[in-house]
């Protein structure tokens, strides 16, 4: 099957998106739907992955906090940030979660190169980090994206790359 690409420009409710992904994963596993890459943004929300700690949120500013079953720590989502959810059937590919994550990370790094933005990953840190722009190296790296992952029957969902912007309400 070909992979469907879905782009949404309005804000999508986080919990509604999770329900949609769970349904889509079931449909993919039963060969009723294509794999999907979904581009969207959420309203202000914190999502807590399976490795989250209570002290990760400095202040909530009345922003909703939702516990998820994806991997990772606490993540802020909000307007202006692009999120990409991958609903990909790894049964039809190599069942290698690390490789899947590496391919997504490298895709973002390669994309940023087109805009003369240097980015990389670090073995001791989670995420994709911007190290410089237009040939200049930054004094401190800035995180631009991270991946949280969940598998159901070897189909990914809640696997996101979270494209950050500097303005965050925390």
Question: What residue ranges belong to the model's regions?
Answer:
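Single conserved hydrophobic/aromatic residue that forms the stacking wall/gate
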Residues: 161-165, 169-170
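Active-site cofactor/co-catalyst pockets and adjacent glycine-rich loops in catalytic enzymes
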Residues: 148, 154
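Conserved phosphate/anionic-ligand binding catalytic regions in large, soluble enzymes, centered on
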Residues: 155-161
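A translation/RNA-centric and nucleic-acid-associated enzymatic feature enriched
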Residues: 145
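N-terminal lobe of the biotin/lipoate ligase/transferase fold
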Residues: 1-141, 151
């Amino acid at each position: 099957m070909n992979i469907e690409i879905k782009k949404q420009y309005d804000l999508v409710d986080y919990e509604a998106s999770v329900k949609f992904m769970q349904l889509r994963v079931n449909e993919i596993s039963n060969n009723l739907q294509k794999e999907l890459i979904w581009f969207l943004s959420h309203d202000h929300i914190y999502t807590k992955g399976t490795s989250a700690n209570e002290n990760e949120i400095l202040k909530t500013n009345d922003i909703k906090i939702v516990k998820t079953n994806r991997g990772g720590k606490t993540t802020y989502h909000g307007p202006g940030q692009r999120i990409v959810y991958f609903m990909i059937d790894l049964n039809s590919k190599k069942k290698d979660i690390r490789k899947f994550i590496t391919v997504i990370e490298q895709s973002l790094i390669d994309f940023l190169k087109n805009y003369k933005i240097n980015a990389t990953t670090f073995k001791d840190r989670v995420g994709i980090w911007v190290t410089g722009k237009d040939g200049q190296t930054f004094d401190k790296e800035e995180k631009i994206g991270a991946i949280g992952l969940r598998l159901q029957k070897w189909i990914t969902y809640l696997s996101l790359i979270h494209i950050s912007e500097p303005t965050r309400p925390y």
